[in-house]
């Protein structure tokens, strides 16, 4: 399939000739590093390859070293794609790939291993995508078949009382501590347990009912206040923490004020320096006028 050479495309014979010229320099050209000496050596090799390529045939259009380098990169990429397609199709190696690809594989055997690694990564990513898709579909099925949640609404009554677990009994300290731990766990999980006399089980929400969040804040606040009343050490720690916060805020305020004053002083000094420079320039100008002969005659 050797046709007439054009200015922008390469024929099959031109591609094969380029690969034959590149073959002695493959070791240098395939060294992937940013060393200056290697880059200079690569440029020198491409200059030599371009000279030898243009000396092959007179009827061919002249090619630059940059154009030949771009063609070489395209041939390598095309060889990788062709090997991947050949592996996916599981066809005969010799009959399915083109001559430039065979030449590239002979020159650079590691391209075949690259294609194997890329194919393995593609298979792994496909399996991961299928597993994620299956997990998403199963989660969607679980959401679709989830039963309707029954909301617990508390009637707006004035006789809402705290939970019985909040009442402290001096005779059962251990039992009280266990109850308080269970209550803290329940409050942390957001569970509300009002008395059964004030609970109305309904399927629809009512705008006149008290939200569960208000009940949660009420119970958690009362429980924390009861804990604070029972433990003076916690009160002392909270007091010290509050004092530290106030001291830090005071120090930060002083720091901000000092920084603001320092900026003001700096601005004032810069203004004074600028005025002094203006005065100096005025004095220089007056001295120059006095020293010049044309001004002194006046």
From Swiss-Prot:
<dbReference type="Pfam" id="PF13873">
    <property type="entry name" value="Myb_DNA-bind_5"/>
</dbReference>
<feature type="region of interest" description="Disordered">
    <location>
        <begin position="191"/>
        <end position="213"/>
    </location>
</feature>
<dbReference type="GO" id="GO:0042802">
    <property type="term" value="F:identical protein binding"/>
</dbReference>
<comment type="subunit">
    <text>Interacts with APBA1 (via PDZ 1 and 2 domains).</text>
</comment>
<comment type="function">
    <text>Transcriptional repressor that down-regulates the expression of the fibrinogen gamma chain. Represses transcription of GSK3B gene promoter via its interaction with APBA1.</text>
</comment>
<dbReference type="GO" id="GO:0005634">
    <property type="term" value="C:nucleus"/>
</dbReference>
<keyword id="KW-0832">Ubl conjugation</keyword>
<feature type="compositionally biased region" description="Polar residues">
    <location>
        <begin position="192"/>
        <end position="209"/>
    </location>
</feature>
<feature type="cross-link" description="Glycyl lysine isopeptide (Lys-Gly) (interchain with G-Cter in SUMO2)">
    <location>
        <position position="94"/>
    </location>
</feature>
<keyword id="KW-0539">Nucleus</keyword>
<protein>
    <recommendedName>
        <fullName>Fibrinogen silencer-binding protein</fullName>
    </recommendedName>
</protein>
<dbReference type="InterPro" id="IPR042383">
    <property type="entry name" value="FSBP"/>
</dbReference>
<keyword id="KW-1017">Isopeptide bond</keyword>
<dbReference type="InterPro" id="IPR028002">
    <property type="entry name" value="Myb_DNA-bind_5"/>
</dbReference>
